[in-house]
Amino acid sequence: MREWTIDTWVLYKVDEGDFDALDFLLAVLRHHRVVFDCERHIEQEYQRCLKRTRNRYLEEWFKRLIARQARVFYSGRLPSRHERALLRMKFDRSDLPFVAVAFRSKDKLLVSEDSDYTQHVCGYLQQQLQVKVLSLSQALKLAEDTQDP
């Protein structure tokens, strides 16, 4: 059972009709856990997405995630030197909690293809924080493999 940090970008892809995004969320719901921050910034972002999209599949996914107790919580604060470094790279401040929980999580997996995750940012996250930023196709393949590494 892996711990996944899922950027809201993935939820918006589901709303756009991306079947890989939907398959990924369903695989995570069946076999894995989703990482949230104790401060609830990520949950608030998810709720904003659900409110904007009014997508019943996303709403049901989120309800089932809670019912299945498939959430795990970590601090959403990054050490300040990493926060400063990312902000210098023009990384969006609202995405910092996602990076922070990915950093603290067991598997250090973050799924996003958002433009904030430039090659430079992804390199920094991998080298300095051991956080691996995965594309949707990479994440789907890994999520469907239910064996832990």
Predicted regions and their residues:
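Active-site neighborhoods of divalent-metal-dependent phosphate/nucleic-acid chemistry enzymes
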Residues: 71-110, 115-121
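Short N-terminal binding/cap micro-motifs at the start of the first secondary-structure element
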Residues: 12-16
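Extreme N-terminal starter segment of soluble prokaryotic enzymes
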Residues: 1-4
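Short amphipathic alpha-helical segments and helix-helix/interface helices
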Residues: 22-26, 62-63, 99
